[in-house]
Amino acid sequence: MPRKAGSVEEAEAGAEEVGAEEVGPEESGGEESGAEESGPEESDPEEPGAAAEMEAGQPRPVLRSVNSCEPSQVIFCNRSPRVVLPVWLNFDGEPQPYPTLPPGTGRRIHSYRGHLWLFRDAGTYDGLLVNQTELFVPSLNVDGQPIFANITLPVYTLKERCLQVVRSLVKPENYRRLDIVRSLYEDLEDHPNVRKDLERLAQEHIENQRMEGETEDFN
C-alpha cells in the first residue's frame, strides 16, 4: 500500500524552530502510526476512480508524488507576509491542501523523498516560491538534519500586482463596472488556479526534458 501525505498531527507549541508545529507522518495505515482519520488532504491511489482511469489506459499526470518509503524530515518556513496554503500532489497528481501557515511561522512535516509540494496564498491562491522555485521535492536528510523549505513572495509583474490589489478591493460581480479596457475584465476574472499552474508546470517539464534529450543527442 503506498504511503500517503494525509494524516496530520499538530505537536505542542514550543518546538525548537521559530513557531514550528509538527505534522504527522504521511502514512497509509493510520492504525500503525496513531495517525488521525483520513482528512480531505488524503487521496488513495487505489480508490475505484483511480483504478478505473488506469484500466481505461489514461496516462498518469507528469507531476505527481513518487511512492517512496524513504522518509524526509522537512520544515516549512513561511517567510512571506501572506497566509500560506501548502499543497501536496498525491500519487495521482491531485492537489491536496494542508493546514495553513500564518506569516512568520514554521511547521515540521514528516514527508518522503520524491513527494511534490507547492505553496499558495491561502486567500487568493496567488503563487508563492519555495527555495526560489515553484515546486519543492524533499531530499534525504543528512546527519539527521531537516530540510528547510523557505516560502517567499515572488517578484510579481506590475500587472500581476495591480490585478491582485483590484481583486482585493472589488467584488467579482463588479469587475465589469470598472472603467478599464475590456481585456482587463478577462484578466481580473482569470483568478489564480492551482490546476492551471500544474498544467503549465507539466508542459515546462516536458519541454525541458525534450531539450535535454536533444542536447544529449547533439553531444
Swiss-Prot record:
Biased composition (Acidic residues): 9-47
Biased composition (Low complexity): 48-57
Alphabetized InterPro entries for the sequence: VHL_alpha_dom, VHL_alpha_dom_sf, VHL_beta_dom, VHL_beta_dom_sf, VHL_sf, VHL_tumour_suppress_b/a_dom
One cellular-component annotation, GO: nucleus
Compartment(s): Cytoplasm; Cell membrane; Endoplasmic reticulum; Nucleus
Protein purpose: Involved in the ubiquitination and subsequent proteasomal degradation via the von Hippel-Lindau ubiquitination complex. Seems to act as a target recruitment subunit in the E3 ubiquitin ligase complex and recruits hydroxylated hypoxia-inducible factor (HIF) under normoxic conditions. Involved in transcriptional repression through interaction with HIF1A, HIF1AN and histone deacetylases. Ubiquitinates, in an oxygen-responsive manner, ADRB2. Acts as a negative regulator of mTORC1 by promoting ubiquitination and degradation of RPTOR.
The name this protein goes by in its record: von Hippel-Lindau disease tumor suppressor
Species, as recorded: Canis lupus familiaris (Dog)
